[in-house]
């Protein structure tokens, strides 16, 4: 079961929530809490409507969804869960200048945030790996069916459930953040024992480092594949140059996905690692809240990156332009199939991303 926190004598080796008096009292000024509250309110509203719209539009064409789209929609589910289940707790607490939901609410909020956050990251990992295999190994797209996507979703939720439930069964806990109006995984457990260090290291590796490595590897390989493929077929027909715009867009999308994730979560991860293995008291309270607020913004712009840009919801702008572009690419595909077999395979890469 989760640890039962009670007041203990003052000791520098104790975590902040055991030695700083009321752990749920805000350590920020009223003004800072109000700013944080309004910021999270705006982020929460935009995220809820953005991800809700994505799910609504997807439900209208649910029978036509491709396997990769099904996995990507799961990202919107995770982000919507963070916005609906998590953000109201912090927003109310910011406006009240203290955490008002007690230890039970703290553990629920910490679990929900970690659960949907982990699910979101693992979904990103699955999508990036799927795209890497489909772009770099064309035969992969032939056998991937909708049922495989649903199996992948089940594995994602099982993975997230396993790691986020472990702190509730005695291997850790969810505790207040140093600034008092939010809760998180007990990173400070690593300061107390070797067992705590092992647990935190496992969390960091399986829920952050490994997924991040897969995402970066996948998109670097995709970028390299698209660039090399363009060079191989560019001299066969001048019409291949029309795909250069698409190539640049794909490169930018991959960079946005990686950059968006890194910008949102790496600062929070750095602070968490320092809290676990460094000198947590050396981090100013006012500074510790910034990575938390930044990480919470990921639920807002993820639907923009994954749904609007990558899956081209904006393609509804002009049907004529889309039809012309499709016709041009299909014509070139037929031409290359009859002349150079290799070039047709490469063109599949570009069409797969359209």
UniProtKB/Swiss-Prot annotation:
SUPFAM superfamilies the record matches: Family A G protein-coupled receptor-like (SSF81321)
The name this protein carries in UniProt is Opsin-5
Q: Please give the organism.
A: Homo sapiens (Human)
Q: How does it sit in the membrane?
A: Multi-pass membrane protein
Domain of life, per lineage: Eukaryota
Molecular-function annotations in GO = 11-cis retinal binding; G protein-coupled photoreceptor activity
Set out the biological process GO terms recorded for this chain's protein: cellular response to light stimulus; cellular response to UV-A; entrainment of circadian clock by photoperiod; G protein-coupled receptor signaling pathway; hyaloid vascular plexus regression; phototransduction; phototransduction, UV; visual perception
Tissue expression per record: Detected in brain and retina and cell lines derived from neural retina.
Q: Gene behind this chain?
A: OPN5
**Residue intervals annotated with topology Cytoplasmic:** 55-74, 130-150, 219-252, 310-353
